[in-house]
Design a protein with these regions (language model features):
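Hydrophobic alpha-helix immediately C-terminal to the catalytic Tyr-X-X-X-Lys motif of short-chain
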Residues: 164, 168, 172, 202, ...
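Amphipathic alpha-helical recognition patches that constitute DNA-binding helices
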Residues: 12, 156, 190, 197, ...
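C-terminal substrate-binding subdomain of Rossmann-fold SDR/epimerase-dehydratase oxidoreductases
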Residues: 4, 17, 30, 58, ...
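Conserved strand-to-helix beginnings and helix N-cap segments that scaffold or border functional pockets
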Residues: 42, 67, 89, 195-196, ...
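A glycine/serine/threonine-rich, flexible loop-to-helix segment
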Residues: 48, 132, 195-203
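Glutamine-centric residue-chemistry signal
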Residues: 78, 193, 202, 219-220
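N-terminal Rossmann-like NAD(P)+-binding domain of SDR-like oxidoreductases, especially those catalyzing
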Residues: 1-188, 318-322, 328-342
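The catalytic Tyr-centered alpha-helix of NAD(P)H-dependent dehydrogenases
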Residues: 150, 154-161, 191, 195-199, ...
Length: 342
């Protein structure tokens, strides 16, 4: 595999994957296809060698452009997505366009040229789970984590659009022989994440002298994974995964939002209660938890960032050291949240 396309490669998770490939696979040339919406940033690719990484500014819904690029590549890794739940509740239309129509455009081109395709998705397609304390197996029993066999039950316009794209990929594999795999990952954290998201929002609030905000009671649980571990898992699936299979990516990082925020405040030298509780998101999923045993057992993948505290400290340090990357957008992001009382 000498040439790959990474859609959304100037965004958070996509750009981290590009860095991972450049740092670990010197034989691979990466073409980044990114629309550079508010969540895409050329600066995320700064410092990468020009002979290894090419940025094409364009829309994955542009069938002519996609066709031109796909016919010259060995594989497409599809990260590009509208992904912020709060935005999907205000205006679902970009989520339908990018996440469904864009994915369709890509798989059609990959089908036409018989190009390997990997579809990056989310655990949110499965809906949510009860809290561990309310389950007979305390979160470890049968059906108490998401598996590749879990029934889809999306609860937001965002997760519904991702579920739709997953199902298109499955249908194209079965109907047309598309050379595809799917991964559904838990919540990512790490460098280059847009400051509208939970962890970077709170870090940059503290750095800006703004009190952090917690939705509702903060008991909602997310299964956190460092984005570097997500990148290594996607590479393992791309190169070793079985065509037509779905792999779940997780690092056993379950934490509720309140605990994450209090740990973040502690690591930043602030009182653990120095935050404001604000109104909850409508339809806020209660708990996500990933069973990644298939990925680990079949492909031999293991996460490296198994200590959430050290991973969070690493992330805090990155935002502290890179204020120029996020500072210009901070006021607008907080003003947007303030309109919703959040």
């Amino acid at each position: 595999m000498k040439n790959i396309i990474v859609t959304g490669g100037a965004g958070f998770i996509g750009s981290n994957f590009v860095h991972y490939v450049v740092n670990n696979h010197p034989e691979v040339h990466v073409t980044v296809l990114d629309k550079l919406t508010y969540a895409g940033n050329r600066a995320n690719l700064a410092g990468l060698p020009a002979d290894r990484v090419e940025l094409v500014v364009g829309d994955i819904c542009d069938a002519e452009l996609v066709d031109k690029l796909v016919q010259k590549t060995d594989a497409v890794v599809h990260y590009a997505a509208e992904s912020h739940n709060d935005n999907s509740l205000k205006d679902p239309s970009p989520f339908i366009q990018t996440n469904i129509i864009g994915s369709y455009t890509l798989i059609e081109a990959c089908r036409k040229y018989n190009v390997r395709y990997h579809h990056v998705s989310t655990d949110e397609v499965y809906g949510d789970l009860p809290l561990r304390e309310d389950l007979p197996g305390h979160g470890e029993g049968a059906g108490e984590k998401f598996t590749p066999e879990t029934r889809y039950n999306p609860s937001s316009p965002y997760s519904s659009s991702k579920a739709s794209s997953d199902l298109l990929v499955r249908a194209w594999v079965r109907s047309f022989g598309l050379q595809a795999t799917i991964s559904n990952c838990s919540n990512n954290y790490g460098p280059y994440q847009h400051i509208e998201k939970f962890i970077p929002r709170q870090i940059t609030n503290v750095l800006s002298g703004i009190r952090p905000k917690l939705y509702g009671s903060g008991q909602n649980v997310r299964d956190w994974i460092h984005t570097n571990d997500h990148s290594s898992a996607v590479w393992a699936i791309l190169t070793k995964g079985k065509i037509g299979e779905t792999y779940l990516i997780g690092a056993d990082g379950e934490q509720n939002n309140k605990d994450v925020l209090e740990l973040l405040l502690e690591l930043m030298g602030q009182p653990k209660d120095a935050y404001d509780q604000v109104k909850d998101r409508p339809g806020h999923d209660l708990r996500y938890a990933i069973d990644s045993s298939k990925l680990r057992e079949e492909l031999g993948w293991q996460p490296e960032f198994t200590d959430f505290k050290s991973g969070l400290q690493h992330t805090i340090d990155w935002y502290r050291d890179n204020e120029d990357w996020w500072q210009a957008e901070k006021a607008a992001v907080e003003a947007n949240y303030a309109k919703n009382g959040q």
